[in-house]
Amino acid sequence: MSFGGGRDHQFNRNNMGSTHGDFRGSRGSDRNSYNRGNDFRGGRSFGRGPSRDTRVDLVAPNWDEELPNLPVFEKNFYQEHPDVAQMSESEVIEFRKENEMTISGHDVPKPIRSFDEAGFPSYVLDEVKQEGFAKPTGIQCQGWPMALSGRDMIGVAATGSGKTLSYCLPGIVHINAQPLLSPGDGPIVLVLAPTRELAVQIQKECSKFGASSRIRNTCVYGGVPKSQQIRDLQRGVEILIATPGRLIDMLEIGKTNLKRVTYLVLDEADRMLDMGFEPQIRKIVDQIRPDRQTLMWSATWPKEVKQLASDYLHDPIQVQIGSLELSASHTITQIVEVLTDFEKRDRLAKHLETASQDQDSKIIIFASTKRTCDEITSYLRTEGWPALAIHGDKAQNERDWVLAEFRSGRSPIMVATDVAARGIDVKGINYVINYDMPGNIEDYVHRIGRTGRAGSTGTAISFFTEGNKSLGAALIKIMREAKQDIPEELRRYDRGQYGQHPRYGGGRGGRGFGGGRGGRGFGGRGDGGYGGGGYGGGRGGFGGNRSRDQGWRR
């Protein structure tokens, strides 16, 4: 079966917005496209949609009537490699056991063991090999054959397991087999993600691996003006990565449509449901033809996610990597210190002194509230530490700048609320410090999962107070499973008598550092950095930076 030919030549165009997209101009199509006059929001075509101030309620089409009028599309592109075909049943079982794979569903394809066995066309395979990966991750070994086969599928795997490429690369193959977009068409691939940070990270992967196919994408999320996102959508994109709320906005004001979507991805489905996006997800999915291919990815498998899968996936196959029990990576050293709120500041300073001995260290410090986040940052900057803050009250351009400074190592300490717990993929994070414990054990696992990724080692330090006692039993269970040393002070919380279920039990956050003075900045960089006292002063905003050879502190 053909993977589809190369895409028509297009000129490159830089995206000047904040989404880092790669837009290559609109293209005429020499392939057949179905009639775009019927826009399932009430008969109005995309080009003649409602005015910017007019919203149209999204109503699910009558698919029994609509589906027979839609064109048939290809979605099974999997060609089993001869070496995979020769694997015996016992070899398949042993490989899955070694990689901690649990499989469910019927006619599940055999796993692949190398990139060459995946069956990707050369234009995809070459991009992968250029990245220098040694071999596929466990979720990719089983996920690629499942996704390429056109089946609805569920992948349950921890953050950092390589799941983005598990659906991104098959999505590129899927796009290249479909008719080209015509003016007014919506995307072919839709990826829903819970946060803008995760959405932007997904977009970077799509841009990188879709470049050779000239596949266009954009990222749609809240917190920034709609204008650039609308322009991107109106030019036409094959891949749309979106947070549910902003996508609903775009659909209701007629700036895009989902008629062409035949490949739907729900990434971090558990997180989207935790954040209350279930009504928006259902409203969005109801707008998409039911014979699409749907891929659901999740780090956990609670009953709410199971119900969503039951409602929207048809005869799915599933791969689970690791135990269904919540667990932390064994490459992370977990250190828990039982103390009082008033002891936190001194302990934080001591750990930073240790971490800063490695000039290449990157550290994330998690706080429970935006206020505490800013207070920690202000204190650290006053003491000469190169710290910046990121949380939901920061403007998007400031958040992007902070992440860029952190990634580059120019500001190796980032203080964050849980907005950064998922979706931020920064390589080389050595330390995670939970200044405040999170509200539930899932967030603890996701927080510390920022370090120890892709086989590297990392350290997670957590400050545990009496106010966190409802997390004690669950925390000890996580540490025992990962074979970590449990301090005697923590063992007394190893009882199920504190009233709250560990999933929902939350301790109160720390009290912060009081007011704190504004950070002093860290000198001006010769390359035109944000020098001086910083943009945002005591709130940990755009401070200047010291060059790496000057060390971390003043």
Swiss-Prot record:
Q: What EC identifiers does the entry list?
A: 3.6.4.13
Return one GO MF term. RNA helicase activity
Which residues are ATP-binding?
157-164
Q: Motif DEAD box: residue span?
A: 267-270
Q: Locate the motif Q motif.
A: 113-141
GO biological process: one example: nuclear-transcribed mRNA catabolic process, nonsense-mediated decay
An example Gene Ontology cellular component term from the record? nucleus
Q: Using the UniProt annotation, give all residue ranges assigned to the region (RNA-binding RGG-box).
A: 504-531
Instruction: List all Gly residues biased stretches.
Output: 504-544
| Record InterPro entries | DEAD/DEAH_box_helicase_dom, Helicase_ATP-bd, Helicase_C-like, P-loop_NTPase, RNA-helicase_DEAD-box_CS, RNA_helicase_DEAD_Q_motif
Q: Which residues form the Helicase ATP-binding domain?
A: 144-319
Family annotation (Pfam families): DEAD (PF00270), Helicase_C (PF00271)
Q: Where is the composition biased (Basic and acidic residues)?
A: 1-11, 21-30
- Give its localization: Cytoplasm; Nucleus
UniProt keywords, alphabetically: ATP-binding, Cytoplasm, Helicase, Hydrolase, Nonsense-mediated mRNA decay, Nucleotide-binding, Nucleus, Ribosome biogenesis, RNA-binding, rRNA processing
Region (Disordered): which ranges? Answer: 1-57, 496-554
Question: What reaction gets catalysed by this protein?
Answer: ATP + H2O = ADP + phosphate + H(+)
Grouped into one coarse class, the protein's main location is cytoplasm
Output the Gene3D superfamilies linked to this UniProt entry.
Answer: P-loop containing nucleotide triphosphate hydrolases
Known role: ATP-dependent RNA helicase involved nonsense-mediated mRNA decay and ribosome biogenesis through rRNA processing.
Q: How does it assemble?
A: Associates with polysomes.
Entry's free-text remark on domains: The Q motif is unique to and characteristic of the DEAD box family of RNA helicases and controls ATP binding and hydrolysis.
Protein's recorded name: ATP-dependent RNA helicase DBP2
- This protein's gene is called DBP2
